[in-house]
Each structure stands twice: as structure tokens, then as C-alpha cells.
Amino acid sequence: CVLIEVGLARGLDPQDALETLFEAGLEQGWVSDGLIAQSLGQRQEFWSVREHIPEANRLVGSVSSHDISVPISLVPEFITRAGEVIAELGPMLVNCFGHLGDGNLHYNVFPETGKTRSDYLDVRDLVKGGVHDLVDELGGSLSAEHGIGRLKTADLEKYGDPAKLAAMRAIKAALDPIG
């Protein structure tokens, strides 16, 4: 599912622009179905669904959640290949959403229906490693918009550029000499 909102120059019809975009997507095989909001209320309903995804994800409980980015041109490849990585590890569900215009993705892996995240403790690290290895291979980042924090410091050490890490440490030491 992709949610697209357009802003156009005065005098251009957003309905026509979206229909043209949709038709091109159908012809390329990128789109199989779609809706165009017919009112402000319907537009708000579409956005409400998108805005409630993080809350729904928390209620389900993920096997592994990722805030990653990849070059925009490689988003389709990432989604396809990451799905293959997950499928090799067992039956799981993927919820990928984000900001396609800048390559930032929330790539979340969930238990299959009828199971819980505790059923996947033995593969959580494999899921995380598989996703992070692919992000690294594609020249992306393990942290798109939510920062590294304490949970991702080991990942930063593993996948980070040594020169950038040294610069980060120097800045940290200069700003926080006590630690």
C-alpha cells in the first residue's frame, strides 16, 4: 500500500495528475489497485490509517523493528530482497512503511497469525542481522530518523564507517568530556 499526496502549481488538476500516475503504475505492473480521495474527509481518513500504523505495530508486538534508509532508487530492491531474507528464516509477516520520497523505511517483522513474538526468540538476531546486512550492502543507514540510541550502538560499531565513528567520538568527547 502506498499513500501519495501531491501538491501542484496553481491551475493544475491533482485528480488528473494522480490518475495519470496511477495509469502509468498499472502499465508498469507496479500498481494493482488504488483509490483517490474524493473529499477532504476521505483524505483525512486515508492519512489516519497511515498515522495509526505505529500504534497498531506496538499492539501486535514485532519480532524485529527497523528504522532504516536506502537510496531511493533501491527501495524496491530492498523491499523484495528483505522479504526473501525473512522468508528464508521462517513464516513471518512484514509491515514496511515510511517516507519513500527520501528512502526512509520502517521495516517491521511480525509473528505469523496465531503466534507471538516470544515464538521467534531464536530468530530475532538473524532477522535483524539479515536486514542490516542488506541495508549495508545497498549503501543505506541503520538509523533513518530516530537516531542510534543505546540499542543500536553495537550495530553502529559493526556497520559504521571507521572514520565517521572516530569523528563522532571526537565530537562527543569535546561536548561531553565527563561522558
Predicted regions and their residues:
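Noncatalytic alpha-helical scaffold of FAD-dependent oxidoreductases
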Residues: 1-179
